Amino acid sequence: MTVVLFGFINIPSIYAQEKNKAMAVENLPYTPVVTPNGSTMPWTLDKDGAKVFRITVGKCQHEVAPGMVINAWCYNGQTPGPTIEVVEGDLLRIYVKNELPEGTAVHWHGIFLPNGMDGVSGLTQKSIEPGQTFKYEFRMTQHGTFMYHSHGDEMTQMGLGTMGFLISHPKNPTGPKIDRDFAIFLNEWFVEPGTKTPNPNIMTDFNIFTFNSRAFPGTAPLVVKTGDRVRVRFGNVGQESHPIHLHGFAFKIVSTDGGDIPPSAQWPETTVVTFPGQTRTVEFVADVPGDWAFHCHRRHHPMNAMGHDAANVLGVNQDDVKDKVRDLVPGYMAMGENGMDEMNYMNMKGPENTLPMMGGQGQFGPTGMGGMFTVLMVRDNLKDYDHPGDYPHPKGTVAGSIDQEKEKGEK
């Protein structure tokens, strides 16, 4: 007999995931991980005590942000795939069905296991051909943040989205209790404007940068209560390194894909770099309420639909050229003469299925952000972790124009 113990509906919404988790959290020996804009993989228990997970790899439609959908290759219909959560010591039995048009295998990145379960096509196993189902089985002897991803035609399969987290909680946890635990995949894509299929052949010139395969303003915020101890796990199987910066707080890097970092070797940071093939886990106490920016600090990564090899027109008067171009392209709008902030306010129609360069709005206006950007929302006295709305700043704590102050003084 197979017994369903724990799982969540595969809904790409952090809020639906939160409500499902609330019903099961009391019976768990750990704080469940939240995968913003993602989900956690259900499992069943076999008679021998093995936790059974089922993965189908195939094609899917994936929303990067409102207004942009891509043709992705996915695990269980989503990218990143559902997060697998286990406890150190668990016996895992994972069935993988291939619905792709080519062979594949699944590698359990950073996990110590028998060589034949490592998941490398041709080297440690035969390729899982289209229509076939393979079984992986191993005991989880570690705890920490790990990843699973394709290991056959990596360029195409991972380039189109086949990756996910495998998180192993310690059997005997030590240290302070974690109140909120998040997992975020860092990735980059090249999608030709006006098209839907990412080009996996691109090596460096990416134009879409994502947290969990979503670009701002499509990224879910991280909602926490004031005083919560927060853990954020980052994973990267892309091409680029990403320095992720948190406003308002310092954190400590507590573990890597290689294991825990002893407290004596930890130091405070406000930016953590995760290189390709690595995971990094940070912890901090969210003790100051507000809406705090959380983003990649490479200048082009918190933007969307980035172009390459464009002419530098800073300081160039484009009025004459603009009029001539409009004769050929009605509605053409010149840009870049005074910087790119004007993109926040322009309503220039772009190619179909293409995000604006900077499309996010805050309570005070355009943010000038896109791509790898989200918000840590810290609030006092939250009843739940639903979106709390804009932060109500106390009077006198928001920067403002001194011209307005002068006008008030004159009156």
Could you say what each language-model-derived stretch is?
Residues 1-411:
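Copper-binding active sites and cupredoxin-like electron-transfer domains
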